[in-house]
């Protein structure tokens, strides 16, 4: 798969469980006034819940269209990220907050507008970016760090998120820097997973393990994967505000063996499921593609491997911590099982059962099993 296909896959996934404390223990903070741009989608509710649990005062800014009534007791300012649409950002004028957490910014023009308007009224601007905003990923087994250059576009004025999601996030970061150069925090998550994720890119795995039987495991156990539980990310965002962390942070677990991830997921939800490892070359012959048919995996010998090989050392040193893979698997499956039956029958990612069975049958035939 080419980088452009990977970017398209990430963009396609754009879219409240208990929040046990996993972040490194810190003293109870002084209450802060926080503004969250968004707050009612996937990452937002987890961030709001954790901020409230920490004693902070939260104000939401959104269009009032997603999950209405989710936080009825919170002040919600209705507006639009686009300053040219209806009242735009006018509801934020003249207000002051200790920090803003921007988890709904995708277009540099709009992010620049909010950062410029709030520059004199917030102490810190935390922007949720993406690990794919880098110019390119590292190849050859070296873990990429925050010093890698950002992506560039031939046409920086484009607002085509479906084609240039990653690059536009890089320009969003630049827009925040231009407005608030010394008080900006860029949190760069990889694949965000867990309860409320509507993309199913991760969810496919616990759901598939729970179904049982023979499960196609792509590649080799030693290939790498990376992700972050949405609740761990939410806690880190609030932690960055409480601690005043400025700068860029890769927010992913450090690369872990693909085999241990699949085994942990299986053991958490259905230890009787059987993993059958099928090499990358055979999968390619049968049109099984990473980040298309199977998510969270790339062959260690392919150029795509660098997409799952980023260093999180800086964020970990700043306080980012991770819950066990088994907990993420169990909680995600429990949430998924609360969805309507028709939705549960229509996974939005991963191989359908017929294709998986056909590839496994072909593999066994080749191996003489």
What is the role of each PLM region?
Residues 4-25:
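N-terminal export signals
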Residues 61-65:
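N-terminal Rossmann-fold cofactor-binding loop
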Residues 78-96:
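Conserved Rossmann-fold cofactor-binding substructure of NAD(P)-dependent oxidoreductases
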Residues 97-151, 171-173:
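NAD(P)-cofactor binding segment of oxidoreductase domains
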Residues 129, 172-196:
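Conserved beta-loop-beta element that borders a ligand/cofactor-binding pocket
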Residues 236-313, 330-333, 340-368:
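Mid/C-terminal beta-alpha module of Rossmann-like enzyme folds, strongest
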């Amino acid at each position: 798969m080419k980088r452009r296909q990977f970017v398209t896959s990430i963009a396609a996934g754009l879219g409240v469980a208990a929040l046990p404390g996993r972040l490194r223990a810190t003293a109870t903070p002084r209450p802060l006034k926080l503004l969250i741009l968004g707050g009612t989608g996937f990452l937002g509710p987890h961030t709001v819940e954790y901020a409230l649990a920490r004693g902070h005062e939260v104000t939401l800014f959104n269009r009032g269209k997603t999950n209405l009534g989710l936080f009825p007791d919170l002040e919600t300012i209705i507006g639009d990220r686009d300053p040219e649409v209806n009242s735009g950002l006018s509801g934020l004028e003249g207000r002051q907050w200790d920090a803003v957490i921007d988890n709904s910014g995708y277009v540099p023009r709009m992010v620049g507008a909010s950062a410029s308007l709030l520059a004199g009224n917030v102490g810190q601007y935390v922007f949720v970016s993406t690990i794919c905003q880098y110019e390119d990923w590292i190849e050859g087994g070296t873990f990429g760090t925050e010093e890698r250059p950002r992506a560039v576009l031939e046409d920086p004025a484009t607002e085509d998120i479906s084609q240039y999601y990653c690059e536009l996030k890089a320009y969003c970061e630049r827009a925040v820097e231009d407005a608030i150069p010394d008080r900006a925090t860029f949190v760069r998550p990889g694949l965000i997973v867990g309860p409320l994720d509507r993309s199913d890119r991760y969810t496919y795995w616990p759901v598939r393990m729970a179904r049982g039987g023979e499960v196609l495991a792509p590649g080799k156990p030693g290939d790498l994967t990376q992700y972050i539980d949405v609740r761990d990310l939410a806690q880190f965002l609030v932690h960055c505000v409480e601690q005043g962390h400025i700068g860029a942070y890769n927010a992913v677990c450090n690369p872990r063996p693909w085999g241990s991830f699949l085994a942990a997921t299986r053991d958490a939800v259905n230890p009787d499921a059987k993993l059958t490892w099928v090499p990358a070359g055979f999968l390619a012959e049968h049109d099984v593609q990473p980040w298309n048919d199977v998510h969270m995996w790339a062959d260690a010998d392919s150029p795509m491997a660098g997409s799952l090989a980023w260093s999180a050392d800086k964020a970990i040193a700043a306080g980012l911590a991770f819950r066990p893979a088994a907990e993420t698997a169990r909680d995600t499956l429990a949430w998924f099982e609360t969805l309507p039956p028709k939705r549960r029958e229509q996974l939005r990612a991963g191989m359908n059962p017929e294709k998986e069975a056909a590839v496994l049958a072909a593999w066994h035939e080749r191996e003489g099993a």
